[in-house]
């Protein structure tokens, strides 16, 4: 209660201490990069998870999804998380770092802590588990952090019952400028970590880390927007995605628990001060410069896997959100298939809303043999479609199968995309 009252008092007292100068205007389309989830496993479909997704197109934080503070952490001194430094506008979630006019002492964790810098934190109200998570963000050009991460409590029962553990999954952490300090490399590229926080039966605490994943880049994270993504695949592994780069993969630390990352975590977007002297503290000049002191989150998006044929009807979809260039594709130009009364055809599609895929099978002379319709539920799907035939087809020349993705009850005239595959029948 003392801690909550102290934070509230600080927010009220300091909310008006800072002059609000208009920052440089950024466009959410400054640079196009790869975005959206990777190809899903066979038989699965990525769908948007709205509880952890936000385009930040309003004028205030969506309090049905987010807290404007960290519920259990007030910040790493000398940086204090303050709700006054969180805002939404111009299509962005903004976090503004500032120098406090005077030192502020907060009594927390059984001691007095001195703060002189204002930072910010936005935390999801719900916890989540496996899925793909990404954000598009431009870092502040300071030594304060720009982060996209998840964590749990540290009080889950361990394998010995008397021990405890917690989880932290850092998709990305960075700063926005370089300097003469060891952590200067955090100002460029992407840096991903996974922590297994462990307390043994004697109360000794350990930070067990998986090998760090890095993507190198010549440009600073504050020069432009970047897309950072992470696929929490299962209890043991994750994959990371940086702009248009191929993914890199990580195996979680598993010497205490064979499947360590088995608990839900909360999403956290944080602008904090890092440990000094590993990273230099931000100076007053950069903290007073509106062109440098603000983090811009363009959007955060989360996806979960469902079965291909799951309508996902319990989730309300936003028809204005165009996540994909809608398409249907086959994995190759030709396939071989054993002669049968059905054809099993691998394909994938991306659809912003429920669509249908029209299949037409032709013989070598262009004669239409079979037509069929597949309902393509919204999302990114990878599947094997079974085309039922009236009879076994003769061997010989290849057959052509065309696929058109279109609106429900549509026709060829309003086709959104089409693909073709040639099928060679074998005995």
From Swiss-Prot:
Its main location: periplasm. Its EC number is 3.2.1.178. GO terms for biological process: carbohydrate metabolic process. It is found in: Periplasm. One of its GO terms (cellular component) is periplasmic space. The active site is at residues 168, 173. Keywords: Glycosidase, Hydrolase, Periplasm, Signal. Residues 32-308 form the GH16 domain. It catalyses: Hydrolysis of beta-D-galactopyranose-(1->4)-alpha-L-galactopyranose-6-sulfate linkages in porphyran. It comes from the Bacteria. Gene3D superfamilies: 2.60.120.200. Coiled coil: none annotated. Substrate binds at residues 73, 76, 168, 173, 272. GO terms for molecular function: hydrolase activity, hydrolyzing O-glycosyl compounds. Residues 23-45 are annotated as: Disordered. Residues 1-19 form the signal peptide. Belongs to the glycosyl hydrolase 16 family. Cleaves the sulfated polysaccharide porphyran at the (1->4) linkages between beta-D-galactopyranose and alpha-L-galactopyranose-6-sulfate, forming mostly the disaccharide alpha-L-galactopyranose-6-sulfate-(1->3)-beta-D-galactose. This is Beta-porphyranase D. It comes from Zobellia galactanivorans (strain DSM 12802 / CCUG 47099 / CIP 106680 / NCIMB 13871 / Dsij).
